[in-house]
Swiss-Prot record:
GO terms for cellular component: chloroplast; ribonucleoprotein complex; ribosome. It is found in: Plastid, Chloroplast. It comes from Chlorella vulgaris. Belongs to the universal ribosomal protein uL5 family. HAMAP family: Ribosomal_uL5_B. GO terms for biological process: translation. The keyword Ribonucleoprotein applies. The keyword rRNA-binding applies. This is Large ribosomal subunit protein uL5c. One of its GO terms (molecular function) is structural constituent of ribosome.
Length: 180
């Protein structure tokens, strides 16, 4: 099933970006490569229920099962042993990636209190964008009564853009709300 944002990209974003940046053909136009959603769960090493509930929440939000990240070495001051669970990662590609970005831009971000837009400074210099979300409640799929604790997540959007200017133009065509 073709996602709404994917068809919008094909029909409107590509011609607009070709006109703006004077690309020779449509294969030079930057596109989304993947979206990586990461959640660090510090207390998951002591409590298995935390890992289970966060995994369930993340799979509801992303509609894809996450991979548990484990510690690489033991750190006594954090009460952490080697290979203990410390987080969850989901990598979205294809239709699920476009569906998640569409829900993030049009449903989740507008639900944030006092939201004025996402930062323009979160580009990495190579056309990729990262943002941190402070709570999972901004997604309409998450029920307030069923969460045990408010936890955030990091969202990294990887594009094929060579510069931040190209990536920002791509995100603006998708309707990403940037601060002035």
């Amino acid at each position: 099933m073709v996602q709404r944002l994917d068809s919008f990209y094909q029909e409107q974003s590509i011609p607009q970006l070709i006109k703006e940046f004077h690309y020779k053909n449509k294969h030079q136009v930057p596109k989304l490569d993947k979206i990586v959603i990461n959640r660090g769960l510090g207390d998951a090493s002591q409590n298995a229920k935390v890992l289970e509930s966060c995994s369930k929440e993340q799979s509801i939000i992303t509609r894809q099962q996450g991979v548990v990240t484990r510690s690489k070495k033991a750190i006594a001051s954090f009460k952490l042993r080697e290979k203990m669970p410390v987080g969850l990662v989901v990598t979205l590609r294809g239709d699920k990636m476009y569906a998640f970005l569409d829900r993030l831009i049009n449903l989740a971000l507008p639900r944030i209190r006092d939201f004025q837009g996402v930062s323009r400074k979160s580009f990495d210099g190579r056309g990729n964008y990262s943002l941190g979300l402070e709570e999972q409640l901004m997604f309409p799929e998450i029920d307030y009564d069923k969460i045990d604790q408010i936890r955030g997540m990091d969202v990294s959007i990887v594009t094929t853009a060579k510069t931040d200017k190209e990536a920002m133009a791509l995100f603006k065509t998708f309707g990403m709300p940037f601060k002035n």
